[in-house]
Structure formats: C-alpha cells, structure tokens
UniProtKB/Swiss-Prot annotation:
It is an enzyme of class 3 (hydrolase). Heterotrimer of UreA (gamma), UreB (beta) and UreC (alpha) subunits. Three heterotrimers associate to form the active enzyme. It catalyses: urea + 2 H2O + H(+) = hydrogencarbonate + 2 NH4(+). It comes from Mycolicibacterium vanbaalenii (strain DSM 7251 / JCM 13017 / BCRC 16820 / KCTC 9966 / NRRL B-24157 / PYR-1). Its EC number is 3.5.1.5. GO terms for cellular component: urease complex. This is Urease subunit beta. GO terms for molecular function: urease activity. Transmembrane segments: none annotated. SUPFAM superfamilies: Urease, beta-subunit. One of its GO terms (biological process) is urea catabolic process. The keyword Hydrolase applies.
Length: 104
C-alpha cells in the first residue's frame, strides 16, 4: 500500500442513501453568477436566488461534500435537496441564522 492511498471495495457508493429528497426550481434574478456550497442551509443562500425558501427550510443540496452549484443570471434550475443532518443547528451563515431547525 502507498501512504495516503485509498483502496475501495467493488460496486458503487450512493451518496445520501435513504435521505428524503425535495426538488425545487431556483432562478438567479441577479446580474451576476451565484455559487452555493454543498452544506449551506439553502434558505439562507444569496437573496438574488428566487425559490420557495419556506419549503427549503432545514435542507441542503443533494451533492457531494465540498462541491457547489452555480446559478447563472436569469437561468432557472431544478435542484434536489436533502435534510441537514447531525445536530440540525445552523449558526452564523447570515445575520439571522435560524439556530436549532427542529422544535424541541
């Protein structure tokens, strides 16, 4: 084995297997491209993105970690979302972060 090498088993790995998925159309109404990362709480994304923010509450993009989706000005895209995992708390992404996403 080479130091740092990864040895994977046979077959494919499905990311976010078993996660509830939500599809939403998003359009960039601004005049510049907007890029949003994989683990951003989607409702807190750039204000130039037009979509149902209430429906997206508690969700992130269903894309691999460390990647992003780019929204070009005036272009609508259908995106797939999955629920944020872990402690489901969002802090500091905007001036009004929601904190705990689930009522307790």
């Amino acid at each position: 084995m080479i130091p740092g090498e990864f040895v994977f088993g046979d077959g494919d790995i499905e990311i976010n297997a078993g996660a509830v998925r939500l599809e939403l159309p998003i359009v960039n109404t601004g005049d510049r491209p907007v890029q949003v990362g994989s683990h951003v709480h989607v409702p807190q994304a750039n204000g130039a993105l037009e979509f149902d923010r209430a429906a997206a509450h508690g969700y992130r993009f269903d894309i691999p970690a460390g990647t992003a989706i780019r929204f070009e000005p005036g272009v609508a895209q259908h995106v797939r979302l999955i629920p944020l995992g872990g402690a489901r708390e969002v802090h500091g992404l905007t001036l009004d972060p929601p904190g705990r996403l689930d009522a307790s």
